[in-house]
Each structure stands twice: as C-alpha cells, then as structure tokens.
Amino acid sequence: MELKWVSCRKQSLFLISCLALLCLASLDTISCESTQNATDFKKRSQTVSCPPDWIIGPNQTKCYAYFKNSTSWEKSEMFCRTYGGHLASLASSKELSFVQKLCNGNVSSCWIGGRSMNSSTSGFRWSWSDPKTPQWNQSMFPKVPIRTRCGNGNGSSSCRANICIAVTNGSSSIFGERCNASHAFVCAVDSDIKCRNCHKYLVILAVVSGLILFTTFAIILWLLVYKRSKKRRKSRKVSNPASSSSVVPPSWKIFTSEELRSMTKNFSEANRLAGDAKTGGTYSGGLSDGTKVAVKRLKRSSFQRKKEFYSEIRRAAKLYHPNVVAIKGCCYDHGERFIVYEFIASGPLDRWLHHVPRGGRSLDWNMRLNIATTLAQGIAFLHDKVKPQVVHRDIRASNVLLDEEFGAHLMGVGLSKFVPWEVMQERTVMAGGTYGYLAPEYVYRNELTTKSDVYSFGVLLLEIVSGRRPTQAVNSSVGWQSIFEWATPLVQANRWLEILDPVITCGLPEACVVQKVVDLVYSCTQNVPSMRPRMSHVVHQLQQLVQPLEVK
C-alpha cells in the first residue's frame, strides 16, 4: 500500500509540473506576440469611441460637439457637464484650429472653457474649466483682447474679474467678453478608448490560469482525501470494536440444519426460551467450543430466497456493539430460516418488569437507570455511528435482553423485516386500540426515521420507571388505559414519586431525579418528530443521573 501511495504521489507531482510548464509556455507565447506587434498595436488594436453626433479631436483623446444654443458662459458650462464634460479647453494650436473650424462653419463666435481669475495672491490670470487641462499656455495666447465696455486691452481689474473666452473667425483667434453675454458653445468630453485584442488575451490568460488552478486544486484535494481515508482504514483495524460501526464478529458463519438440531437437542421444549412463539420460538444451545448461543426460529416464508436472506443477515451481523445482541450466524433450509445470536443470561426485560423470574429480585432504581442508559447507548450507536443510519423500528421491552450485570442488549437489529406483518400488527395495535411503542407519524403516515426509535424509547423509558405496560386494564368502568393517560395527571400535579414502580422499596431516588427522567420521557415522545432529541443527547442526560450500582 505504501508503494502505491508513493507512486500516486510521484505521478501527481509530475502532472502538476507538466501543467505548470504548459502554462508558462502559453504565457511566453502571448508575451512574444505582444512584443513583436508593439509597433502596430495602437493602430490596429485600439478604437476610439465618441457619443453619437460628437467628433473626435485631433489628439484622439477628446470628443467635441458644437451647440448653437445662444446662452451665457455659465449655462453653457453646466450644459456640457450633463454629458460628463466641460466647455472645450485648448492645449495646442491643433485644437485651436479644430475648434475654430467647428465654430466658424456655423456662427462667428463660440464660448470655450477659458475664464479670468483674479486673486489677491496671484493677481489676474486665465484658467480652464476642465481641471485636467494644463495651465494657460502664454506662448499660444500672449495677450487676449477683451471686447467689453471696458474697451480693448486688458481694462481695469474690476472689469476683468468676470471675463470669459470665446473663439472667433476674425483677426483675433480668441477674445474675452463678459460671461453673461450670449454665444453658441463647444463642449468636449474624454473619448472612450477600447482595445480590440486585449479582451482576447485576457480571456486566454484567464482560461489557462483557471484550468491550471482547478487541476492543481483537484489533485491536492484528491491526495488529502486519499491520505485521510487511508489513515481511517488503519485506525478501524486497531480501534476498539465497541466504537466501530462495521466490525464483523470473527465467529459469524452459516450453519447447517443438522448443526442447529444438535446444539438445541432437536429444538426440544426444555431448551425453549421464554419469548414470542408467534415468530417461531427461540431455543438455547451451545457451539462446539462451549459458547452458549440462542437460536431463533423464523416462520416459513415463500417470499424470500436463500441469497436474499443471507445478504440481510450478513448486513445485520456487521452491526457489532456491546449493547447490541451480536449475530453469530444463520441457516436456510428448504424455506426454514434460523438466526443464531449470542446468549444473554438474564433474559428479556419485560419479564423483570412484569413477571420477576423465580429466584430473582425486583429491579431497584439504579438497575433501571443503568438499563435505560445502556439501551440508549446501543440505539445511539445505530443512529450516529453506522453509515447509513439504522432504524430499529421495533424497540420494546421484550426486545431488550439483560446480562448478568443488568446491562441492556438490544435484540432484532436489522431483522425487523423477518417478522411477519400480522405479528407486527398484533404487537403494535395493543389492547384498547392504542399503538403502544409506535410513533404517531409511523402509524398514520408510514414515515419511519430515527426519531421514530426515539419515540419508542421514550415509551419504554416510562415503562421502566413505572413498571406499567404501554396499555393496561384498569377496571370495568375505565377499561384500558395508556401509560400516558395514567402518568400525565401525576406529572401535572408534581407527584413525581407516585410515578415510580411500587416494587421499588429501597434506594428511592429524590423527586427531582424522577422529574428529570420523566421530563426526558415527554421530550422523546413529542408529537412533532423534529422536536425530539437525538439519542446521543438522551445518553448524555441519563449518564448525568446514573449512580454506581450497589455491590451486594
């Protein structure tokens, strides 16, 4: 495996290097082509865009438009700004000649962007309304004639304070006049320079770079996932089987019918264990190495083939946990089906709750709390550790076996489909028409989720605490009563200790402890499935209440 990992890593690094060289070659090609065509780039790759009906200027950087509206300089400037520009500013003799031709073809004079400025520090000077235009070129306009009532020449400083510039076709190329005078005007805006081939180069660069980055990221991600999965597989091999979600017990095998008859003494009544005979019965037996097992005999079925049966048992046998009854093997013989699982010494929970075995003693509070906690751990394993999740679907007192230390072991995991439908109906539709352990969404809408198991556990938890069955006869007047119909009035009256099983006479818990357990019961049995807690949360809550069992 290590050699394969090194080989894969070398191949991946080689692929990344090749892609990087390909990217550099592509970029060099683009760079060389750009360098060789640098001379013709401006001519062939750039286009100048102007607004409709505007004309490009001599320097290819501005667009100009003539407007014949006769108005003042201020209003002309405001109008030009609506286009995102200003009155025309002149930075060269070419621009002056261009604006003169644009204006003189229509009228005698037009406003442009020049205006007088008079300050106490710098004195009188000319400036342009467009701040991006260079300062006034004195060599171009050494002396601007002023045509106002101030007379020709520069006039007084007070007269020159509100003078604006216009172009003309007369002897003077430009002249100054009162800004409130009315003239046509010429506006200028920056041209929009577009690159024809730049977009193509950018697209090529983006595609090549994106491909390189995506491929590199995908390879790195694959390497990380592969390395992580490899570590996970190694850890599963050395981890504790109790924490694994798919550990196959080494003793799992397919038995012959002769082997089963031999180990159960031909399924004698002496070897028959207490249980539900309607499903075929359960018998005790022993393997050749002396290990005790239980053999569950299922009723004949013509709907399931041998291959399907073995497949289901194999899948169920992988679900190994200390609080789940382990499957040791199975047998299929001419339609007869048998399941062999580990023997749990103390038998089913319902016997200890309702019919204490001869020579046994009633369950005290600590025992019951330990049973509930270990059972919750087994269910939480099915919901949270197994992928995909396993829904038990048939959590009830007779499906919980107790070991010698009164730890719970959940039986029938993954085997609910082997129980005939009519038997399921008899189990779930209990006396009085109630549905016992089944969640309402499963009964009425056939919706089965892990939350259905949480509901069933809540019913069973109340049964463990109270010693009452999910449905039980009261008297001739009341008839049958569900466990919640009995418990709810006591809960509402805060009579917590009256909920306890009357056989609990020693080691009674405090009322607040019983209240916490009953609150957990009602939390698990809420009508809305999404409001029920996860089994891992239930385990945590119960572990906070568990007290060490008394050693007697």
Curated annotation (Swiss-Prot):
It is a single-pass type I membrane protein. GO terms for molecular function: ATP binding; carbohydrate binding; transmembrane receptor protein tyrosine kinase activity. Its EC number is 2.7.10.1. Keywords: ATP-binding, Cell membrane, Disulfide bond, Glycoprotein, Kinase, Lectin, Membrane, Nucleotide-binding, Receptor, Signal, Transferase, Transmembrane, Transmembrane helix, Tyrosine-protein kinase. Disulfide bonds join C80-C187, C164-C179. Glycans are attached at N37, N59, N69, N106, N118, N137, N154, N169, N180. Pfam families: Lectin_C, PK_Tyr_Ser-Thr. It catalyses: L-tyrosyl-[protein] + ATP = O-phospho-L-tyrosyl-[protein] + ADP + H(+). Its main location: membrane. This is C-type lectin receptor-like tyrosine-protein kinase At1g52310. It comes from Arabidopsis thaliana.
